[in-house]
């Protein structure tokens, strides 16, 4: 009895409430998976019904997790004590409601903005070529802008990882960035 009380006092309840406007998710099973050695272990699941899903459980520690549909990772988030709200649409995914998820998705928003600027830079290069600008002028301008964006991205990532070295976000985001995991982009498009 004492050991049961000791276990429950260390455990924390989490509750996930999600909504999705992506119609192809209706009727699908979503799984919460956490790293376990060299594989991902499913710890919870729910069916998406009319764009809504709910999960709840007990975790013994705060950990990085991913929401999966079949074998496809849709998004990262943090399993921690509290109510976690997940919103999925065709353009983006947002997780809020708990301190670390709020912090993670603030970072995701900033990173997405930089990614959008990098995409626009590629379009700008194409427009410059179509406008007949000199190739060396295009190269200089685009290279300068790419280097500026890369420096901003590196500064953003470095600051985030340093500020979160003492929790699961620092190492979790570091690993995701090093493995080119697409953070924040909807990967469940129709």
Write out the residue ranges for each language-model feature:
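N-terminal alpha-helical segment
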Residues: 153, 169-170, 185
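Short coil/turn linking the two alpha-helices of tandem helical-hairpin repeats
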Residues: 178-181
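Amphipathic alpha-helical repeat scaffolds of TPR domains
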Residues: 166-176
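Residue-level detector of conserved catalytic or cofactor/ligand-binding positions
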Residues: 183-190
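Sec-dependent bacterial lipoprotein signal peptides
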Residues: 1-8
């Amino acid at each position: 009895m004492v050991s049961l009380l000791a276990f429950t006092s260390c455990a924390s309840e989490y509750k996930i409430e999600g909504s999705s406007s992506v119609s192809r998710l209706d009727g699908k099973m979503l799984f919460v998976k956490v790293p376990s050695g060299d594989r991902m272990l499913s710890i919870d699941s729910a069916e998406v019904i009319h764009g809504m899903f709910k999960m709840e459980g007990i975790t013994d520690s705060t950990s990085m997790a991913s929401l999966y549909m079949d074998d496809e990772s849709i998004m990262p988030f943090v399993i921690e004590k509290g109510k976690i709200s997940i919103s999925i649409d065709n353009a983006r995914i947002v997780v809020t409601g708990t301190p670390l998820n709020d912090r993670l998705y603030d970072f995701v928003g900033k990173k997405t903005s930089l990614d959008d600027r990098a995409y626009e830079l590629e379009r700008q290069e194409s427009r410059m070529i179509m406008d007949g600008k000199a190739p060396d002028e295009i190269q200089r301008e685009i290279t300068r802008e790419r280097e500026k964006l890369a420096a901003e991205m590196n500064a953003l990532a470095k600051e985030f990882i340093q500020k979160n070295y003492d929790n699961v976000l620092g190492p979790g985001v570091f690993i995701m960035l090093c493995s080119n995991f697409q953070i924040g982009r909807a990967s469940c498009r129709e």
